[in-house]
Amino acid sequence: MAATAQTHFQSDERHTSLLSATTLVGPATVFVAAGLLAPLAILFRYSFNRFEPRRMMVETFSLDNYVKFFADPYYTGVLWTTLRVAALCTVVCLAMGLPLAYVLARTQSRFKNVLIMLVVLPLFVGNAVRAAGWMTLFGSKGFLNVTLMQLGIITQPLQIMFTEGAVIAGIIAVNLPYMVLTLQSVIEGINRNVEEAAFSLGAGPATMFRRVLLPLSLPGILGGTILTFILGMNAYATPVLLGGPKFKMMGPLVYGQFQLNNWPFGASVAFILMTATLTLTATANILIQRRFRR
């Protein structure tokens, strides 16, 4: 009798817990569906329509926009440039962010919070403002060129602005805090005794990093690389301001098509960008996890 009553009580408790969870998750689910999935579905449908200057968009179902993109070397070149820049920025952010995150996670200094604030501080400034700051540094009369000329290192200003290098530097500056914060939170959760045990067994710093810290930091590495790669692939303000009109990435290309009222082609470019980003991040995730499971 008591067992039956306890079973009913546990069943009611689970039902109440499930109902509460549904109540909490429900509004967010509706918001995401209405604010993200529905517009994406509409945009996906637009990508199969046809563009006409006078009518803007003609309802049809054709793959012409996708064929146009992959048949034109210019557009495939823009996609390749975007992939290259995003991948390079992600690798540099990981190489710079991992040591910095390790120091922040392990330091006992009373200035730790100050150091974290210095990492977070750039996030309080918009991408356009940060890009404008880089323009004052990289310009022909910017701080870098003026300093080098005054020191006699160069006689003519270096052409840094409106180059791929300027865009890469700007995107790295934008994405680096995300990488550092993601890695720091994971490294702080790794027990220090694990590292000390590796050292006591004769492992050097390089071996400890490769055999102990790196595998345990894998969730943070995956999260940070995926986040920075997605941000790099979809960058807009930085390529526009630091790359100029001749340097094209997918984000500005999508926006440019919508400015020209070519919604069908703009929608197809947007979905090509999204598909490439999701495919590459998922593939990298699978390959990295398989590598560290061995």
Residue ranges and their predicted role:
Residues 1-18:
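Short, Lys/Arg-rich, polar N-terminal cytosolic tail immediately upstream
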Residues 12-16, 56-59, 63, 69:
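Short, membrane-interfacial amphipathic segments enriched in basic
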Residues 17-52, 67-188, 212-236, 243, ...:
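Membrane-water interface segments at the C-terminal ends of transmembrane alpha-helices
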Residues 55-59, 236-261:
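Glycine-rich helix-loop "coupling/hinge" segments at transmembrane-helix boundaries
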Residues 59, 202-205:
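Polytopic alpha-helical membrane proteins, predominantly small-molecule transporters/carriers
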Residues 194, 287-294:
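Short cytosolic juxtamembrane segments of multi-pass membrane proteins
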Residues 198:
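The alpha-helix within a helix-turn-helix
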Residues 201-202, 215:
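Glycine/proline-centered hinge or cleavage motifs at structural transition points of membrane proteins
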